[in-house]
Structure formats: C-alpha cells, structure tokens
Amino acid sequence: MDGIMKNDLLWFGNHVFDLTPNSFDSDFVEQLSKFEGKEGLKRKLFDSSEYFQNFSFQVNDDLLGKDVILDISNQQLTPAVPGCETSSNSKLISASKEITSERKRAKSSVSPSYLTDSSPSDLSVENKVLLTCPSWDGENFKNLEARSPFISEAPSRVYDYFLHNQDWSPKPLFSALQVYPLATIFNCVAGLPQGFESTVFPWNKTSSTFELDPTISVSGMSDECFASIVQKFSAIGGLIKKALNEFSLYKTNISFYLSNFIVNGVLQYRKEFQRWLRLYEFRRFGLIGLSNFVNSFSSFFELISHFLIKSAQNLKGDSLLDFLFDYARSCQNTISYPIALQCLIYCSNPYFKRLELALKVSCAYGHIDSSLFLSLPRFFPSELCVSIEQCIQFLSLIREQKEIFNKNNKEFINPLNIRFAYSFNDINQACVIEERCNFSSLSFGNLEQTSVNNDSEEFETLLAKMNMTPDFNDNLLQLKFTDDVRNVCPLNLNVCCCIAEPIQSFILSFLRSTYKVLKNDFQVFDLLNFFHSTFLFQNYEFSDNVISLLKSRRLDKSDRNELAEDLNSDDRYNFISRLKKFIFMEKEKNGLSRSLSKSITFTLDSASVSEFEDVYPDLQFQCQVIGALRILFTDNSLNYYSKTFSYVLHLFQAQSDFESSVELKDRSIVTKTTIMSWSKYQGTKESLFQFLSIYIPECMLPFTKLLKSIYSPDCPTNIQNSAIKNAASVHEQCTKAIYQKVKELFDTMKLWESSIKVS
C-alpha cells in the first residue's frame, strides 16, 4: 500500500506522521486503509480531513522546502516522549509542503538490485538521509526514482536498514528522533551571521567558535554548498561576538570612539539584516540569496577583523589615529574605502575638536597644551607641523604679555573648522560653514571675559573639556554600507582641504591679528626701524657720551690692564650703570616709553667670548628680544647682533684709549708717527660711523621691506605662514653680513693698534 502504519507511525509518500492516540481517530485510520492503491482519493482525504487542521505537519507557506531531512544514528535510542531521554545527535527536520507533481510509486517489494547492494545489519548506518534531493550524489543514486513508498532516494544502506530490519519496524529508530521545523533551521542559520547562538548552533566559550553539526542537511541544496554557507556564517558570527567582547572596554578616548563605531556598526548591520529578512522571504531567495546579501557587508567585516588583530598591540592615542589613517589609505580604490573613511572620520573628529579647542584656548588665554601639539599625527604634512610649531613658539613668547591678551583677545579669535570630509559635497559645505563659523558662539564659554584671574572657574572648565571625555550617549550616524566610491573624497584631498588649509589660515589670521595689535600698542614698525638701522650707536651724541664715559675711566691709567683692574672694582658697577642709563635715555629719545622698551634689552655681560678673550673681557654686549618680536629673530640672529655690537663697543673703547693716550703725551713733542696714527684713527672712526649709519640700514632693507609687505593692510590673504619663516631667514642673512663687516673693521683696528705699538 501507499501508506504503511506501524507502531503508531504512519508512513505516507514522503511524510512521516506520529499516530499517537491524541493525534488521529481510529475511524480515520480505518477509512484511510480503504483507499489502498488510490493515490488521488487518499490525498483528498488528507486535504479535507479535520484531523489535519491542527496537525504540526500540515502545509505551511512560511516554511521552506518540501521534503524530510533525517539524521540517523545506529545507537540504541529511547523514545522521545515525556519522561524519556532523547539523544541530541538525532534530528528530524521536516517541512510540510507537499509535492505537487504526481509520481509513480513502486511496489512495496524490494528490487533485486537493492538486495545485492544491501549492507549487513551489523554495519554502521549512514548518518545522513536526504530525501527527494535531485542533486544527491552519494552512493551513485543521483536522480533515481523513489524505490520505496516510505523514503525517497535514500542511500542503499539506510534503505536496507529500514526495510530489512527484523520485523520491518522503524520504531527503534524513529521513536527517538527530535522534530525541528525547517523554518527553525533557517532561523538558526540566519542567526549565525548576526552572532546569535541557538540550540542548533551553540557557542563554545572555550574555543570562541560556533559548534557546527555536520549531520544537518537541507533538501534542494548539496551538502557541500550548505556546509560552506554555514561555515561562512559561523565565521562572521564569531567575528561579531569577538568584536562585541573585545571592544566593550576602552583605554583611551580614541579607542572608545573606535569601539563605539564597531558596536554601533554591528547594531546597524543587524538591523539591515533583519529588515532584509522581513522584505525578502526565503522561498524567493533562500540561503543563496541570504549569503549574497551578507556579502554586501564584507568591507565592514574586514574592518572588524583588521582591528581585532591590531587590538592586541594596545595602540593608544595618536598611534591609533595614525593606524586608522593608514588603514583608510590602504583601502583606497577598493570597495572597503567608504566604510574605512567613515571610521576614520568618526574616530578622528574628537581629536580635531580637541585641537581646535587647544588652539582657541592658547590664543585667547595664553594656555598651551604642549602634549597635544608635540604629538601631532604622522599624516599631518611637515609644513603644517612647522607652522603649528612656529605658532606655539610665538604664543610661548607673547603669553607673558597678559595685558595685551586681556585687552585685545577678540582680535585673536578666528574661525576654524577642521575635520575629514566623506564626499566632495561635504568639502563644499565645510567651506560655507567655515565662512560663517564664530568661535564665540560655541559652547565652551563666553570669550568676552578672558581674564584668567577673574574667570578661573571658566578656564578650568575649558581645560576639562580639552580632555574630551567620551560621551556614552554619543550616537553614531547612519553608516553607508556601500561600495560606490565615485563621490567619496580621497585622503590626500581630505588632508589638504580639510586639515592643512584651515589650520594654516587660522595661524596666519592669528599672526595678522597679533601684529595688528602690536603695531597699535608697540609702534612695531618704528621700533623695528630704530632697532635695525641705528641700534643706538648711529646717534653721534650717544656715541660721544659712551666714548667720554670710557675715556673718563681710562684717564690717569698707564695701560689696559689697569683699566681691567679698575673695572673689577666698585667703579665697574658705576660704569655699567651709567652706560645702561645712556642706552635707556637714547631709547626714550626715539619715542619708546619705559614700559614698551622692555621688548628689546641691551645688557653688559661679563662672560668672555673667544673673540674678546684678550681685549676687554668684561665688556660683552648681549642683545635680547622679549615678546612678540622674538619670532622674527632666530638664535643665530641674536648671536650676530650680540657679537656685532660687542665689536662696536670695543671699537669705541679702542678709540677712547687712543685719544686718552694722545692727551697724556707731551703735546710739545709731535712726531710724524703721532700724526700718521691720528690720521689712521680718524679714517677708522669714519669707517665705523659709515658702517653704523649707512651700511646697517642698507643691509637690513630687504628684511624691513619683506616684513612690511607681510603685515601691511594690503597684504593678500593667501600668504602662507612660511612667509614668516622666510622673513626670519632673510633677517639672519642680513645680521650675518653686518657681523662680517664689523669684524673686518675690528681686524683693521687691531692692525692699526699694532702699528702704533711698533712705532
């Protein structure tokens, strides 16, 4: 017959029904037996019977597949009834959709070929049974007709084990089978790539992997295909579970944002995944379609895998930021670039916000977060790092002028908007935002009150915000899981347009504002003109006063050693004090008040210099520049200035010595040598004054013009900060030329002194 009932099991076609007392009425079974050999009537009976309305194996459109999948074990199993144990290795996965096509049923007798191919009863049973699968290729039974009304297209040994058992009873096998609807299997498989464990695929905490049962098969799909999909899904699910566990803790601010990006990305991926499951049913696409959908997130999985490997290195701070940038750069021109750039943007924005705030606080308050500026990311251009270094150096020099900051802080506030852009449109929007951006409207305080002493609480608040404590409520924007890179902004353009240019503009604007203030308060150009062209000694009256002072200390002294001895006495202090007084009086004559003249100081230092070890070691002229002007003076420039005017001072000393020696001589005796010496002395003296009044201004002219061109109101706005560095370099060249010229004069003077001694 087409349906065989044995031990409360009904075998009909490719369905197996458990006929427990609560399942079917005996009248129904009796009625069913009357239709033996009449397939169509029997099917109508099944379709119209009220007993099948609540039966678990009725046709359900939500379930995929149409056949029975069996997992058989040859061990002695116990029935799966309440109170009895059931082996977890044996499963029956059943789908209820009937086969619509009519199929010729073979007689219940076993064909001779199966009798010859049958295996002995003591052999192990094939542990996989795949019913009505046209692609079954095991045991060379591919695309064969069903050989039994009970099981379709089963391997021969399994078939023989069922039919040639002692009493033809499958009860010892099938009574212990666990029944899983096919939808349950699909749900478990769909949960794998989301990182969800299930009873079918449990999570092994020891090995941190999903446990896969190789005995599970799906009809309509080869074992190899199903196994590959399950392995692929389990690998993705394991990656997600590891990522959620690994990135649950963070050690630095940037690592927090990286963790937040990955965790929120996983949540968005799961949301998109479940949305696809709702919109596209399995019966339309199946596991193959689901696998293709998961492939669209391959770049996100690659990013997770990449950072899971590198997380063991415990990257921190800027090293992690550089690592994010390097990863995004390595992904350029690939489908992984969009998601890598989004990760870089999200994780780097807090750093750029902190950099903006640090520059803002530095300019408005004079506070400098050196740790932030000394550890700039490697992807910053070298020119940008130099500009920032010069700006910080400039700030460190002028932050002592608190009165200037408190009075003119609004002049130092400039717009700044630095962060990476995702697309070309974002760059255009950033330019618009930068034009209308005003730092005074931001949330970190009212910048009109910038006195550190009066607003200490506000200043401390700003410093606390510079730490950029992570916000746990920070929600990640909707990620773009796309492989379209046509409108995605390249990294080089990102760094140039979104990082370098805004910072360069900010620094240049700040320097312009600073020099504008200095021009109004310090009369910077008058000071520079005075400093570069005269340096005190161009004025004849001042020079005569200095020479007279030196001569007064030389009178009644026989030689230079006595002068040195006298300078080491108490009179030395009076001498230096009077010389400083002359210097200060000269500066006041040039319109420099007592407070503003502190920017440039001239001191006498007793430290010996190699050039002057034998000539007046106690008279060393030291040039110092304090404040905003210091950025225009390199260390070499200051050294050249000190040496230059030390030479000048010693030339004056030599002149005073010669004049004193002439005055001490007997005037009645005028020799030819004395006349010649006096003539040479006058020539050297004239050369010295020409050097001070003509050579120095002409030599400093290139630097003076360059400085005025940079900071004049008509200066173009696109001048980069490198112009300031160039001006300082030109300044150094000018001072070097001046130093070489005065050294020639000094050498000439020494030759002249030698000639006098010889004569």
Curated annotation (Swiss-Prot):
Membrane-spanning parts: none
Write down the InterPro entries for this protein, in alphabetical order. GCP (IPR007259)
Q: Tell me where it resides.
A: Cytoplasm, Cytoskeleton, Microtubule organizing center, Spindle pole body
What UniProt keywords apply to this chain's record, in alphabetical order? Cell cycle, Cell division, Cytoplasm, Cytoskeleton, Microtubule, Mitosis
Check the UniProt entry and state the signal peptide residues, or none: none
Give the Gene Ontology MF terms in alphabetical order: gamma-tubulin binding
Which superkingdom? Eukaryota
Q: Name one GO biological process term.
A: mitotic cell cycle
Identify the GO cellular component terms for this protein: cytoplasm; equatorial microtubule organizing center; gamma-tubulin complex; gamma-tubulin ring complex; microtubule; mitotic spindle pole body; spindle pole
Q: How does it assemble?
A: Interacts with gamma-tubulin.
What is the purpose of this protein?
Component of the gamma tubule complex that is required for the regulation of both interphase microtubules and mitotic bipolar spindles.
Record-given protein name? Spindle pole body component alp16
Organism from which the protein derives: Schizosaccharomyces pombe (strain 972 / ATCC 24843)
